[in-house]
């Protein structure tokens, strides 16, 4: 199957409507039974209330998963999505009191409940740890109702606007995904032309896109002020369960080694025979670029996963066979790729925009890595499944490494050169580029006032050039390329999580290949199965690593240097 089968969630919209109305009533009953009464409950009664709360949250997740997936297939159908956002607000409002009232219990009572509810102790402890950022019940209610007219509304506007963009190219109207795939074309004229055409469309929409990112910035500033967050990014670190110190250390390590980016691209310029490497040359193919149709990629991924773990294979096989994956680009379909965790009574759903390129093979592996992680995390209860972004991206990048290792032994030298170059560029995109994005966001959100397009462009160019140093010439057209990146809109300060995951995976994968950890596979599957029920520090600690140690990041960076050295040796043979 090449398109989603959403019947695992709901058979039709009527079933969705009936389920939603039932859950609204259930949430009203929950509010009636427990609001202003938590302090009167004994431990068994509180555990039952907690499970009821969890079930209602899972129902919410199920409703919005179905609605969001329909929207992702056709982003012009925003009214249906908005309708159910409003319906779900009714449920959310009825549940709003629970976490707030738990945090207001006496320390003795909250500790008694936390100790008794062993399966939820990490979740409850986190609530207590961050309760200083809570507002009053009435204030939280106002925030809830305003949320769909704030950043969420601008996120939807961004999605609808970007998916509607058509880029004129050689007599055709291309989507964002289709024109960006031209950046990998071997013909420099095509790359240059595609970059110019895409830039022109972004520039044409710059007023709208600049306004959207300014509104995201303003709302984040206001929420930080209201909740008492120390800065615009701290709420992301809290949800990622990582310290500001650890994030700063990660960024400093990346910046310290920007020379690896420069080293690689200078060699690439030599290989291509160019006097100057431009921004549209970054992904120019080296050697023979292999093409992978979806069937070929499916078989490669399944074989690579099978070689690592039968569990990985079984989950991926089900994804291919049972309508978990929506494969090809379509008009009005959301761009990019994702794996949505959905709920444990269904299964994850993967969105692709597959165009038979080598990078599509690795995108497939990446998203199925998420799928495997999400499916394994169904082993813990719904409130414990919410994995921090830092560890959520680990499984996806690890899956890419499995596929890279699997196919590199099966390629000819010319294809191997291309594979190595592409893998290194993928690592740069996942590590260094995400640090570049985070530094761009830091500067953007540090500005008090609304920024003009020109001011945003300037910050973007300055931060981008730091990464490339003198190895890549950024043309003036590149100045607007911040404006199509969805993470800046949907999830501010998300991007460092990719960098974190990349270095963590390189450290883990190096440990796996070294065979120094005899039970690595069992430990790794256990780590994924724990979902968000323990901290990232504890998860990584299972392998003997300490993410708070600033030297930890150097382990992954050494693996990047090793890959670059292997590429250099291969190229000089």
Language-model segments: residues:
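Catalytic zinc-binding patch centered on the HExxH motif and its immediate surroundings
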Residues: 290-292, 325-347
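A well-structured
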Residues: 1-287, 569-573
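Active-site recognition of the HExxH zinc-binding catalytic motif
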Residues: 228, 355-375, 396, 401, ...
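C-terminal, non-catalytic "cap/extension" segments appended to globular domains
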Residues: 125-132, 270-277, 364, 372, ...
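Conserved binding/catalytic microenvironments
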Residues: 322, 352, 359-361, 367, ...
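Short pre-active-site segment immediately N-terminal to the catalytic Zn-binding motif
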Residues: 290-294, 345-365
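Post-HExxH zinc-binding segment in Zn-dependent metallohydrolases
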Residues: 388-416, 423-425, 429, 501
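Long, K/E/R/D-enriched contiguous segments that form extended
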Residues: 267, 271-307, 313, 317, ...
């Amino acid at each position: 199957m090449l398109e989603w089968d959403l019947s695992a969630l709901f058979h039709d919209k009527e079933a969705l409507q009936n389920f939603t109305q039932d859950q609204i009533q259930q949430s009203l009953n929950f509010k009636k039974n427990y609001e202003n009464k938590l302090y009167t409950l004994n431990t068994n009664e509180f555990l039952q209330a907690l499970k009821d709360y969890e079930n209602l949250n899972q129902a919410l997740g199920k409703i919005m998963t179905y609605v969001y997936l329909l929207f992702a297939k056709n982003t012009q159908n925003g009214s249906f999505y908005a309708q159910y956002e409003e319906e779900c607000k009714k449920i959310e409002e009825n549940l709003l009191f629970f976490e707030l009232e738990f945090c207001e219990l006496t320390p003795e009572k909250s500790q008694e409940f936390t100790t008794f509810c062993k399966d939820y102790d990490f979740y409850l402890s986190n609530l207590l740890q961050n309760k200083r950022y809570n507002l009053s019940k009435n204030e939280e209610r106002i925030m809830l109702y305003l949320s769909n007219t704030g950043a969420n509304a601008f996120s939807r506007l961004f999605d609808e606007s970007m998916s509607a963009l058509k880029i004129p190219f050689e007599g055709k109207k291309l989507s964002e995904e289709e024109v960006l795939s031209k950046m990998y074309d071997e013909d420099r004229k095509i790359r240059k032309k595609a970059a110019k055409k895409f830039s022109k469309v972004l520039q044409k929409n710059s007023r709208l896109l600049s306004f959207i990112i300014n509104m995201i910035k303003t709302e984040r500033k206001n929420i930080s002020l209201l909740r008492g967050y120390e800065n615009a990014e701290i709420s992301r670190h809290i949800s990622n369960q990582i310290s500001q110190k650890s994030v700063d250390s990660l960024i400093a390590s990346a910046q310290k080694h920007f020379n690896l980016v420069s080293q690689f691209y200078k060699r690439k310029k030599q290989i291509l025979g160019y006097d100057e490497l431009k921004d549209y040359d970054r992904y120019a193919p080296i050697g023979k670029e292999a093409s992978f149709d979806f069937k070929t990629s499916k078989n490669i991924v399944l074989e690579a996963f099978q070689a690592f773990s039968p569990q990985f294979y079984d989950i991926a096989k089900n994804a291919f066979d049972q309508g978990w994956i929506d494969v090809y680009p379509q008009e009005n379909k959301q761009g990019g790729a994702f794996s949505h965790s959905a709920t444990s009574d269904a299964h994850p759903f993967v969105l692709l925009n597959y165009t038979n390129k080598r990078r599509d093979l690795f995108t497939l592996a990446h998203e199925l890595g998420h799928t495997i992680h999400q499916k394994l995390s169904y082993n813990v209860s719904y409130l414990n499944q919410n994995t921090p972004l830092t560890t959520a991206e680990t499984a996806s990048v690890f899956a890419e490494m499995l596929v890279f290792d699997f196919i590199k032994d099966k390629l000819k030298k010319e294809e191997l050169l291309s594979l190595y170059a592409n893998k290194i560029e993928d690592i740069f995109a996942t590590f260094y580029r995400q640090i570049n994005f985070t530094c761009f966001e830091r500067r953007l959100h540090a500005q008090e006032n609304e920024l003009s397009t020109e001011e945003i462009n300037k910050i973007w160019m300055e931060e981008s050039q730091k990464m490339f140093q003198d190895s890549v010439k950024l043309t003036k057209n590149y100045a607007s390329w911040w404006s199509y990146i969805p993470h800046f809109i949907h999830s501010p300060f998300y991007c460092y999580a990719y960098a974190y995951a990349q270095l963590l995976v390189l450290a883990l994968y190096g440990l796996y290949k070294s065979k120094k950890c005899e039970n690595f596979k069992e430990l790794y599957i256990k780590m994924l199965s724990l979902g968000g029920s323990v901290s990232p520090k504890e998860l990584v600690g299972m392998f003997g690593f300490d993410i708070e140690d600033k030297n930890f990041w150097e382990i992954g960076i050494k693996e990047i240097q090793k890959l670059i050295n292997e590429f250099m040796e291969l190229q000089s043979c």
